[in-house]
Amino acid sequence: MVWLLFLSSFCFADEVVEIRISGNKRVSETTVRGLLHVEVGQDVASDELNAVFKRLTASRLFSSVELDLTAGILEVKLQENPILRNVVVKGNKLLSRAAIDKILVYKKDAIFDVHEFENSITALKSYYRDSVVEKTAISYRIVPIDENNVDVEVTVKEAKPTVIRAIEFEGNTTYSDRVLKHVIRSREKSILRLFGTAHYYSREKLEFDKDLLADFYQGKGYFDYALEGLEERENEDGVVLVFKLKEGARYSFGRVSVVSEKGEIEISDLKEKVRIREGAVFNIGAVRENALTLLSVLNERGHMFVNVVPEYHPDANGRVDLTYHVVSTKKYRIRKINISGNTRTKDTVIRREMLLSENDLYQPSKVADSRRRILNLGFFDEVYIEEHKIDGQNLILEVRVKERPTGTLNLSGGYGSDVGFFGNFSFVENNLFGTSDRLVVELQKASLGSNYSMEFQRKRIFDTFITAGASVFYKNRNEKANGLYKFSSVGGDGSVSYSLRDDLRLHLGYSLSFDKIFDVEGDAPESVKSSAGTKILSAVSYSLFLNKLDNYFVPRYGYGVRFGNKFAGIGGDVKFLRSDFKAGGFVSVFDQSAVLSLIVRAGNIFGYSGQGVDVANRFFLNEMRGFDNLGIGPRDVETDDALGGNFFILGTAEVQVPMRLPVELDLKAAFFYEVGTLTGVDVTTEKVYDSHALRSSVGAGLVWNSPFGVLRVDVAKALVEGKGDKVKTVKFGIVSPF
């Protein structure tokens, strides 16, 4: 409530002979006088008094302001805004309190601004309407505690979520409804989806769906694709979504050229950087990737405020000529970065992955790199960053994300090729409390051993690029199934990692464990018997990871290289130097529907100071499909026991393609070829057969992106075997990120 009483002299200035201030209790009189900008003896007209009124209300210290200038006496009557003690939210079930608090603007134990709070209530209503459930009623009431303190009670009456009963497509002649349902994120209600929310109607989700359909069609040559309409047929049972499409004709790439409006930019060699072949099927993804490649090259050459803009020239023969224009960009300043869709993940987790901040100058290349960094967190299915110009010098960045589950609670049992029958309990949360902290607790009991471990990792320590983690573990393994020994290990490790640059990360670690080999069979090889007993392993390690992948968890293109060394002997009984290497490349094939990967892994270990490498620290190439666990590598001639090796190399070529099954199953078929070997034993007193020959295998498998992680089963046949090798047709396993 605000008042401005008209002056006794409306058009002429009155001299102020006295100033009387009342109603201020917490706010000092000095503060009020500082806002007045009026002194005794000063002539004040109506427009000046109006300015006083505006300053007092703009301070947001007062809920009511009354001014009266009569007979030279300026009376300032104030009513202060109360102090907010607490905000209570009731009735919210579909949206967490943490997510609501991100939208509501308030600060406890601070001055309560009712107008600002009302605006945030409006924002909360909009968020519910677009992202959670429509027709949600939200109200609030102010509960006075005493004269100067209030509580606020927010009541949310969530409507029943609108269920998507069916999804239909019109105008699609090339791709079936089943294929297109795989493309979008909205899902039909199904018995396979009892507990999720993907089948709930959401405007925000539909916006993602529109973008995904456009990327899908234009990624497969349909340059003229358009979504002509989206019909929502609602009834008491839910809603039927009808996407009305215009597929258009299929185009291929024509001529590709690069031109520049800036004469000082050298572009003669830029066309060589474009990896688009004339005659290839038009692909909007390839257009964007090559634009980013050109932009990156230009940035490296010092041209920071340029952009690469594709221009299309379709012809009647189904070809699209493509021209990349190198243009000067006006220097826009980022006034605000808005983030939406993150109902669980804290804004700070996303903002710290942004290479641009508010008040920075806008750079398109940094926007693209920021999107990749956010995706690599592993918390989101989709990330879109759009810019909206607000005037000729400023813009707003809108970051829209679609969150994915980041935690699992698993109680399961089954059979694994490397552990036998097992029972497993695990809790994994990769985004603990929305902070990006990682917590893993795992308890596994198997016929061939047990594994108990707990790991905690915190990213961005002190808001830097440093990640720190620690773990403790106990594991034991019964190798008696192979006629050898029992093994147990208890210990822990600590690690820190640091980003040397955006795509290069350094990892440093220390581990300490007490390893025991016991219950050795009497006819076991002498090298195994000599390893018996308890030894202390104290080791430091480092690794470097060059990450040029589009997505660390599910890569579709790009490459990655990882190598490192582990040095044991910083105290303890065991002395060795171990080296590990992994490199892989990924590319989308078959019109972007499948992914071809080539991966090479290698490792080498050797002892020093007169020590050899114990059997517990050697490599066992159990990952090679077509061969049994302990199936290849050096073997004891007399007992046929596997001894492990000091060197291995394994190369894998694989293609994964989506299967024509219900989208809920999320199954892919994999076809692969592998070649590798395991060799080298430096501690042995017995006769050993050690073939250096390369083995190879070929096979196929099923890959399931399950709630418990990416699982797979493979059927493989060994093509080339070594003497004494053990083959196995079927293997089960869990897929780890690159």
Curated annotation (Swiss-Prot):
One of its GO terms (cellular component) is cell outer membrane. It comes from the Bacteria. Residues 14-81, 82-159, 162-248, 251-329, 332-404 form the POTRA domain. It is found in: Cell outer membrane. Gene3D superfamilies: membrane protein fhac, membrane protein fhac: a member of the omp85/tpsb transporter family. Disulfide bonds: none annotated. Part of the outer membrane protein assembly complex, which is involved in assembly and insertion of beta-barrel proteins into the outer membrane. Part of the Bam complex. This is Outer membrane protein assembly factor BamA. It comes from Neorickettsia risticii (strain Illinois). The gene is bamA.
